[in-house]
Design a protein with these regions (language model features):
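Single conserved hydrophobic/aromatic residue that forms the stacking wall/gate
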Residues: 1-7, 11, 685-692
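Polysaccharide-binding surfaces and accessory modules of carbohydrate-active proteins
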Residues: 16-28, 32-35, 44-255, 271, ...
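Carbohydrate-binding surface patches
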Residues: 31, 224-226, 234, 631-674
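Conserved, mostly hydrophobic/aromatic
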Residues: 31, 154, 280, 395, ...
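Short Pro-Gly-centered flexible turn/kink motifs
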Residues: 106-107, 275-294
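Aromatic-lined carbohydrate-binding/catalytic grooves of carbohydrate-active enzymes
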Residues: 317-394, 398-455
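Active-site neighborhood of glycoside hydrolase catalytic domains
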Residues: 430-569, 598
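Catalytic cores of secreted or luminal carbohydrate-active enzymes
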Residues: 583-626
Length: 692
């Protein structure tokens, strides 16, 4: 009886809150609605997030007052859109500020909202304000109807007399009321990126975060999936897929409350990052990008892929360059003659470009290994007496483009740069210094360091305007966390350092908009959509073993289109055939890092044919819709297919991962084809030496 009375009271209270003054804000895609409402208390609440409502009047069926629990303090509180610390809520807030008088509370009230058309969608801007302190928060939501993607971020500003201290600053908050929640996360390590694992979320908090600073995603990636009511499945069920556009420390909080509702709170990790915000200074959070798919993760991935190509990825609609890299051919040991021969091999292979990797720079402390030279970006004259201009000319003579590797955010203590500017490195005073890969991270919170890092690209391009590509690496997390530049504001280092990186990348893009760049971080430890505004692609992993790459590429494909993912044919796992290695790399942006002279005539011919076919099929693989058909996590096989936008062409990749005992192979049913068309099926990649 008590339960029945409580339910009746809920119904009466909900009808009461549907007063005319309870302004409703609807943020819509073609498939999803996010509905917000101003409560009777003047604060803003989420009332609905789910499948798009069919009728406008359906909005009247939702109320801000959700009766979150039996405890009186929260029984009339709803799902506050940007909850502040110190209010009547018992759960994790989105924002925490310590004001000039020491008060640690922030309560935000609705002020106004507006909407405007932007490229590809509609932006809704909502203004909130604390009624006791001069603090304003602006919430931004950009809805992309066709792609079913919503991008959201927040801006914080105040007009107090002195700086306030920000200790929490989430990008947004989302709420769900389902019977169960199943989280898929993506763990990582060197050569072990994007490993998927799932668990059911129970009462309490699950936190995914990183504290590594620059190479931030080395152990976990900034994206996740949440299955609603059931575990995440490929082709059916409701799934939230979210990713944060931030190259630095991030944090995802998943909090299941006392009545089984889920709060999802993405943002910068506030670890060691109490941020002193000056009056009238705007603190902008990273963008959180999400899609809510009712047709499984496969549809959610296609949503994100299309959105990325259209609106986020640099040159998202352009073609990509196939290449030959010298790293596994030569390591640090090369000269001008060796590189010139490799350029000729690149042309013979049929790729578009030769990419020169690490080891081309530094004179006083030559880059003979990874112990010296980082920071000194003048060409090593013993190795390359003609400098970069001679290499660009040699590439042009070979009829291939020329690209080059840089790692401008780093410095070796054994370098001229460190001798001149030791205060430019992030390094603790009065402590033993810890080196990761024999190097330190430059302090990009310092504007002078930003100028220097930008000059690395500028100097190369001024001398060699025909350089066609940069591979931008970052091999170290931040160690010895201390900024000589920030002095007594060390809580800002993790954030201002990342903002400094973005400042440099913006300058590079503004001045060299047509130069493609690969984002690399000791493999795939950098893979976010803010960085990919400035990079055409990213290096998924140093692990190019085709068996392991199947899993790595499967994981990254959940959030990134194939044209953003680099995959190279190398000598890793020589027990597998060259064909197998080439086929796996062909699922993404194809490249080679292998000695062509090591190949047999048949293997070389196969690679040449594969390059030609990949170029011919690039519009389907790079720009088509991807359908993941058979998961390597569920057995000994893997299959996926791409379908061109006009559905006239499709490409199927299917693998027997560990062939044993002539095991039975199962038929694969393709997806995405037009049932009203007839297709001719051709086996493109054949080889007598095939082992899959």
């Amino acid at each position: 009886k008590a339960i029945r009375r409580q339910r009746q009271m809920c119904i009466r209270d909900r009808s009461y809150t549907h007063a005319a003054e309870n302004k409703t804000i609807r943020i819509s895609t073609d498939n999803t609605d996010l509905v917000l409402q101003v409560g009777d208390n003047g604060r803003l609440y989420q009332t609905y997030l789910g499948e798009r409502l069919l009728h406008e009047q359906d909005l009247n069926n939702f109320s801000w007052s959700i009766h979150a629990g039996a405890d009186g303090s929260v029984s009339r509180r709803g799902w506050e859109v940007y909850s502040g610390s110190g209010n009547e809520d018992y759960f994790e807030p989105a924002i925490a500020i310590t004001h000039n008088d020491g008060n640690p509370s922030t309560i935000l009230y609705y002020v106004s909202s507006s909407s405007k058309a932007v490229e590809g969608g509609m932006e809704t801007v909502i203004n909130l304000r604390d009624d006791k302190y001069p603090v304003d928060v602006t919430l931004h939501y950009v809805a992309y109807p066709k792609e079913n993607v919503i991008k959201t971020w927040s801006e914080i500003i105040h007009q107090e007399k002195k700086p306030v201290m920000l200790s929490t600053y989430a990008s947004t908050m989302l709420y769900f009321n389902n019977s169960a929640y199943y989280l898929t996360e993506f763990s990582s390590d060197w050569a072990k990126e994007a490993q998927m694992s799932s668990q059911q979320l129970q009462f309490g908090k699950k936190v995914i975060d990183t504290k590594l600073g620059s190479r931030a995603a080395m152990h976990t990636h900034p994206f996740f999936e949440v299955g609603l009511d059931q575990p995440v499945r490929e082709d059916q069920g409701s799934v939230l897929m979210g990713t944060l556009g931030w190259i630095g420390n991030f944090r995802f909080i998943f909090e299941v409350d006392n009545v089984g509702n889920l709060r999802v709170i993405p943002g910068i990790n506030p670890y060691a990052s109490n941020y002193e915000l000056k009056p009238n200074e705007v603190f902008t959070t990273p963008e959180f990008i999400f899609t809510l798919s009712n047709d499984g993760a496969g549809k959610g991935s296609r949503n994100l892929h299309e959105w990325a190509r259209n609106y986020s990825l640099k040159d998202g609609k352009g073609s990509r360059l196939t290449l030959l890299n010298n790293w596994e051919n030569t390591g640090f040991n090369f000269n001008q003659e060796i590189l010139t021969e490799l350029m000729k091999e690149a042309k013979h292979l049929g790729v578009d470009m030769f990419l020169l990797d690490d080891g081309w720079f530094a004179n006083k402390y030559p880059r003979k290994n990874d112990h010296a030279g980082l920071g000194d970006w003048d060409v090593n004259h013993n190795k390359l007496p003609g400098g970069i201009p001679a290499l660009v000319k040699a590439a042009k003579d070979a009829d291939v483009k020329f690209g080059i590797w840089i790692e401008p955010e780093m410095v070796n203590p054994k370098s001229e740069l460190f001798e001149k500017h030791p205060d430019w490195a992030i390094m603790l005073p009065n402590r033993d210094t810890y080196y990761y890969r024999n190097q330190l991270v430059l302090d990009l919170s310092n504007p002078k360091v930003q100028d220097y890092v930008y000059s690395v690209v500028e100097n190369i391009m001024k001398e060699n305007p025909e350089v066609a590509f940069f591979k931008w690496d970052c091999n170290s997390p931040i160690t010895n966390i201390y900024s000589p530049y920030l002095k007594n504001k060390q809580g800002q280092l993790y954030i201002d350092h990342v903002r400094g990186i973005y400042n440099v990348l913006k300058r590079v893009k503004e001045n060299y908009p047509d130069v493609p760049m690969m984002l690399c971080s000791g493999g795939g430890a950098r893979c976010d959509y803010e960085a990919l505004k400035y990079f055409t692609e990213f290096w998924c992993s140093d692990n190019t073993d085709p068996v392991e790459r199947i899993y790595i590429q499967w994981g990254f494909s959940q959030f990134f289109p194939a044209k953003a993912m680099d995959a190279h044919v190398t000598s890793w796992n020589k027990a597998t055939s060259v064909k197998f290695r080439t086929d796996v790399a062909s699922m993404c942006k194809l490249g080679f890092d292998i000695g062509l002279k090591e190949l047999t005539a048949d293997e070389l011919a196969y690679c040449q044919t594969a390059v030609a076919n990949w170029k011919r099929l690039q519009n389907a693989i790079m720009d088509g819709d991807q359908y993941r058909l058979v998961s390597p996590y569920e057995g000994n096989h893997m299959a996926l297919n791409y379908v061109s936008k006009d559905t006239n062409k499709a490409v199927l990749f299917a693998y027997d991962i560990h062939p044993r005992f002539q095991e039975k192979l199962m038929a694969v049913k393709l997806q995405g084809l037009d049932p009203n068309k007839q297709y001719k099926v051709c086996l493109l990649y054949t080889s007598d030496a095939a082992d899959e």
